[in-house]
Amino acid sequence: MLLLHWDNMGKIELHHVFVMLSCIYLIFSDISINSAVVFLFSSIFFYISFTAGKRLYYLIGIDKENLKINLKKHYNFGIFLMIVGLIAVTSDLIWVKDVPLFNPLSRKFLNVYFTTLSHLFLVGWAIVVASSNIDKKKILLYTIIFSILIMLLGYRTNVLVLLISVGAILYYKNKISNREILKYGILVFVILLGLSILRLYALGVEGNPITSRISLTMSIYDIIFNNFNGVFNGYIHYSAVFSYLGLCNGARTVIAKTLGIYNVSITPTIVGAVIGDYGTLAIIPYFGILGIFLGFFYKLAKDVKGIYLGIYGILFAYTLIGIESGILDIDVILYYFFGLILCIYAILLRKLKR
């Protein structure tokens, strides 16, 4: 009966899942009341902004017929990105001369540029799925196979991005129902749990693979909120970009060193990164702009499909993962900018057609 009721519900959207996951993080954490209230407010404000973005799409009145979507070109572009990503994955494994999945300590020897380029495989496959009519069962089979390939690099995030983005794309193409997306979500959680247990086993560490990570991440956020509120003055997000040019440490490493922790990187949560850089009030413009953009892009992607839906699927995944890790990688930031460019292109094309 519960599954039947689930199928009769409307579409589950990003802002729904964002608030739900944020609440889960709060439930499994032990942080100060003030920081908890701000964290919850951030997710609720994102929810409201996302809804406003959807409304804005209707107010502007995008005509998808004017966009002249060529799904074949989008498909070919996706295949090209997959090839580049596959070459990068192979090169990275050759570079490190080990398999980080089974030896997590070897992950620090991966080539940062190969690793970054390997993410194009995820983007390419998302675009291919969004631009083609491949059978649903084949897509899921290929996705599992590709997940095994990607997880060799030892990053759970990449596997999650692949699984979540494909699930979102199939769901918004109406190829899977509410009931099926629930089952798919459970499968993704089981895979995450398995990878987390494998990582702890390889490191010889004991503990709950899920709640211990949530508790640690939220405690870091709590420390930033109470002791480093606005202290970084934009340096965290500066590091997210310029660390790839060798000008500074990565954003998460900067946070770790500030807290006196060395040889590891630390995830500050998406809220913690913003507050650490710009102060508590910065969550209003940050989540306001992010929510409006993603709400608008969601409606555009759902109507147009192709590369629009492919990129939205990737942003869907990174936004949810960003609750813990923050949006602090240059390639991920570029995906958001690419999505923004697609939105601007659709708006300008409408204006020019008038």
UniProtKB/Swiss-Prot annotation:
- Cellular compartment(s): Cell membrane
Q: How does it sit in the membrane?
A: Multi-pass membrane protein
Q: What is the lineage of its organism?
A: Archaea, Methanobacteriati, Methanobacteriota, Methanomada group, Methanococci
Keywords attached to this Swiss-Prot or TrEMBL record, sorted alphabetically, are: Cell membrane, Membrane, Transmembrane, Transmembrane helix
Pfam families for this protein = O_anti_polymase
Q: Which residues cross the membrane?
A: 9-29, 31-51, 76-96, 109-129, 144-164, 185-205, 278-298, 306-326, 327-347
What are the record's GO terms for cellular component?
plasma membrane
Source superkingdom = Archaea
Descriptive protein name:
Uncharacterized protein MJ0419
- InterPro entries tied to this protein: O_anti_polymase
